[in-house]
Regions:
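Non-catalytic, usually N-terminal nucleic-acid engagement modules in DNA/RNA processing proteins
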Residues: 1-156, 321-387
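Eukaryote-skewed repeat-based solenoidal scaffolds used as protein-protein interaction platforms
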Residues: 96-98, 102-278
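C-terminal accessory extensions appended to soluble enzyme cores
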Residues: 233-387
Length: 387
C-alpha cells in the first residue's frame, strides 16, 4: 500500500491523500460505506454517494467463536452473511474487514486463528486488527499476535493496526506492540490505521484523537509516509433528542485529521421511554447541523448536487417511523459522502479557504470550533524553553 499526500489546508488538519492498493485508488477525505447481509445497508441501496471503500464490520464473542469452531451450521450461516456483504461492494472498491471480539472466560485461543481462516475472503483487501475488549491488556496482545500471524499467510491481504479506546499507558504499550508486528510481518501496515471511537466522535473523544495525532506524527517520520486515519464507530453525539438541532461532530472528522469516516456499528441499548421520545435527525451540510425531521421539512434544506435520496421522499414515509428511520440514516450517509469531495476540492484549489468554509457552518458550537483549532495547534505547535 502507498499513501501519498496531495495537499493540506492552512491552519487546520484537513488534507487530501491518495491511497493506492494494487489496482484500487482511494482519495480522501472519504465516507466509507458499511456493508452487511441486510439489503438496506449503506452499500446496498443505490444513492448518490461517491464510492471508493466499503467496510464490513462483524461482531463476535468467545461463545460464538467457540460454537463456530464446532458447529457447521453456524459456520455456514456466517459464511453466507459474509459473502452477501462482500457482493455489495463494486469491482473498483477497496473492501476493509473490521472484526470486534468480546473476550470472556470460555475464550479459546485457537478460535481467533480459525476466525481468520474463515473470514479471509479473496475479495478482502484490508483487515483491521480486531477490536478486542473485556480482557486485560496481556490477553489482548496475545490474541492480536495470534490473529496477525494467522493472517500473515494470506496472499494479497494487508493488516492494519486498530487503536482502541484504552487508558493512556495502555495505548502507549499498544503502539509499541504494533511496531514490533510491523518489523516482523511484511503485510502489516503502519501507514494505515483504524481508530475505534466507540459510539463517539473525534470532538467528544479528543483525548483519544490527540494521542493518535501525536503518535502518528512521529511514526510518519519514521516510516517516511503519511498515515491514513480511518475512524470507525463514529456518531454525531449522545442525548440529542433534547435539541431540535445538534452540531454535526462526525462531519468535523476531516478537519481534525481523520481521513476516512466510518459508520457507527455499535448500537446503544436504549430504555423504552427514550425510544418513544427519540427524534429522527436529518443532516444539513450547508450549516453542519442535524435537524429534527419536522424542522427539516419546514427549513427546506438545499440538498447537494448528486442527491438521490431527498426530503420529499422522507416526507412520504413519515407515517412509518421504522422505515423513516432507515431511510433517514441512508439520507445522512449520502449527504456526508457528497460533502467529502467538496472539502477535497477546496483543499486542493485553495488551502487557505478551508478555514473560512468551516466558519460558515452556523450549527457548529463554540466547543467544536475550539477543538478543531486546538487539534492543529497540538500537532504543529512545538513549545521550547528560551535560553
Amino acid at each position: 500500500m502507498r499513501v501519498k499526500l496531495v495537499e493540506e489546508s492552512e491552519g487546520l488538519l484537513a488534507r487530501v491523500l491518495n491511497i493506492r492498493l494494487k489496482s484500487f485508488l482511494v482519495g480522501t477525505p472519504k465516507r466509507a460505506l458499511s456493508s452487511s447481509h441486510n439489503k438496506y445497508c449503506e452499500a446496498g441501496i443505490n444513492t448518490g454517494s461517491p464510492r471508493g471503500i466499503v467496510e464490513i464490520y462483524r461482531r463476535f464473542d468467545s461463545k460464538s467463536l467457540n460454537e463456530m469452531c464446532s458447529d457447521e451450521k453456524k459456520r455456514n450461516k456466517i459464511r453466507y452473511e459474509f459473502s452477501s456483504a462482500i457482493k455489495k461492494a463494486r469491482k473498483n472498491e477497496m473492501v476493509a474487514l473490521i472484526p470486534e471480539i468480546k473476550i470472556t472466560e470460555d475464550h479459546r485461543e485457537k478460535s481467533v486463528e480459525f476466525l481468520s481462516d474463515m473470514l479471509l475472503h479473496p475479495r478482502i483487501n484490508l483487515v483491521a486488527v480486531p477490536i478486542f475488549w473485556n480482557a486485560p491488556l496481556p490477553k489482548v496482545f496475545e490474541n492480536i499476535r495470534l490473529f496477525v500471524e494467522a493472517c500473515s499467510y494470506a496472499d494479497d491481504l494487508w493488516i492494519a493496526p486498530t487503536v482502541m479506546p484504552l487508558l493512556p499507558l495502555e495505548l502507549e504499550k499498544l503502539i509499541k506492540e504494533y511496531q514490533k508486528l510491523y518489523d516482523q510481518f511484511t503485510n502489516f501496515l503502519m501507514n494505515y490505521m483504524f481508530i475505534d471511537f466507540s459510539r463517539s466522535n473525534p470532538v467528544s473523544r479528543y483525548d483519544l484523537l490527540r494521542f493518535v495525532l501525536r503518535n502518528t506524527k512521529k511514526l510518519s517520520s519514521e516510516i517516511d509516509s503519511p498515515i491514513c486515519l480511518h475512524g470507525v464507530n463514529i456518531k454525531y453525539g449522545k442525548a440529542v433528542h433534547k435539541e431540535n438541532v445538534v452540531p454535526a461532530k462526525d462531519l468535523i472528522s476531516p478537519y481534525v485529521g481523520i481521513d476516512i469516516i466510518g459508520s457507527n456499528h455499535k448500537p446503544l441499548p436504549l430504555p423504552r421511554e427514550y425510544v418513544a421520545r427519540k427524534k429522527i435527525k436529518i443532516l444539513d451540510v450547508n450549516d453542519y447541523g442535524y435537524w429534527d425531521l419536522n424542522y427539516a421539512f419546514n427549513k427546506k434544506i438545499l440538498e447537494p448536487e448528486g442527491s438521490l435520496i431527498t426530503l420529499d421522499q422522507l416526507k412520504g414515509l413519515s407515517h412509518n417511523k421504522t422505515w423513516a428511520e432507515v431511510m433517514a440514516k441512508i439520507y445522512n450517509v449520502e449527504k456526508q459522502s457528497l460533502e467529502m469531495p467538496r472539502i477535497s476540492k477546496i483543499i486542493v484549489e485553495n488551502p487557505s479557504k478551508v478555514n473560512k468554509y468551516l466558519d460558515g457552518k452556523n450549527s457548529l458550537d463554540d466547543r467544536t470550533r475550539k477543538i478543531v483549532k486546538k487539534a492543529y495547534g497540538d500537532v504543529y505547535a512545538q513549545r521550547t524553553l528560551q535560553v
